[in-house]
């Protein structure tokens, strides 16, 4: 299927045509193909990648705020010293709360423009959450997933990261980020942005693969925030 993307390697693989094991696809790619055929969901294997990338792009100004004391001690630092800690939020609470409130009120075009502008003006700058040359961090993919979540859900997720500290919750995020495209909207600069009317997150489990504590945490978090999430068992 031409809509499949995956960043995985060295994993158990499946044949996409007859459901038998082969060297054709990982379990995540198998699942992507399944959701495409069954429900017309398009998507990416973006485990622990997509959400931190959107978090970083949308909060870039606050992350690199040089008014916070002692967090930048070298011009070679790629991120502030407290970035992964709970103190990151504590040290910038007022500015972060203001930015989250602003994002939460975004219209679709405002969300697109924010992600797009940061992505294109900061492209190439070393940081811990966006690998510019990796296709999973493709600008159009990140924008589509951002649209699929919508501003309010993104802010709810970001608040969880900020209050918990990224270090403690940066793993365990679902494997698949899926969305449905309902036709095409007008051409906007480089891309056609489809009307996206739903999002689904999926944790993929093969035989004998069990949920980790962080995976359970994120599944519970998404459920509590009204985000469609499920576990897919592949045998």
What are the residue ranges of the model-derived segments?
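Conserved catalytic cores of phosphodiester-cleaving nucleases, focusing on short active-site segments
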Residues: 54, 138-161, 175-208, 214
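Nucleic-acid nuclease catalytic cores
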Residues: 180, 197-201, 225-235
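Nuclease catalytic cores
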Residues: 1-170, 211
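Glycine-centered loop/turn motif at secondary-structure junctions
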Residues: 39, 223-226
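Short, charged, amphipathic alpha-helix that recurs within catalytic cores of restriction-modification
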Residues: 214-223
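Generic preference for hydrophobic/aromatic residues in regular secondary structure cores
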Residues: 43, 112-113, 188, 194, ...
């Amino acid at each position: 299927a031409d809509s499949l993307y995956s960043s995985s390697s060295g994993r158990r693989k499946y044949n996409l045509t007859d459901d038998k094991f082969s060297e054709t696809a990982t379990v995540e790619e198998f699942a992507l193909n399944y959701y495409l055929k069954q429900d017309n969901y398009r998507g990416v294997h973006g485990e622990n990648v997509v959400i931190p990338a959107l978090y970083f792009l949308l909060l870039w100004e606050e992350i690199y705020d040089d008014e916070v004391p002692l967090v930048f001690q070298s011009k070679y630092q790629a991120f502030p010293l407290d970035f992964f800690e709970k103190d990151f939020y504590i040290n910038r609470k007022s500015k972060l709360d203001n930015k989250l409130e602003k994002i939460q009120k975004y219209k679709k075009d405002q969300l697109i423009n924010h992600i797009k502008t940061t992505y294109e003006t900061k492209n190439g700058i070393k940081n811990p959450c966006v690998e510019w040359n990796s296709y999973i961090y493709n600008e159009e993919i990140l924008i589509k997933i951002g649209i699929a979540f919508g501003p309010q859900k993104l802010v709810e997720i970001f608040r969880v990261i900020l209050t918990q500290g990224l270090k403690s919750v940066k793993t365990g995020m679902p494997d698949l980020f899926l969305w449905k495209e309902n036709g095409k909207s007008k051409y906007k600069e480089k891309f056609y942005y489809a009307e996206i009317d739903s999002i689904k997150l999926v944790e993929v489990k093969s035989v004998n693969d069990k949920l980790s504590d962080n995976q359970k945490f994120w599944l519970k978090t998404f459920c509590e925030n009204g985000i469609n999430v499920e576990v897919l068992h592949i045998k």
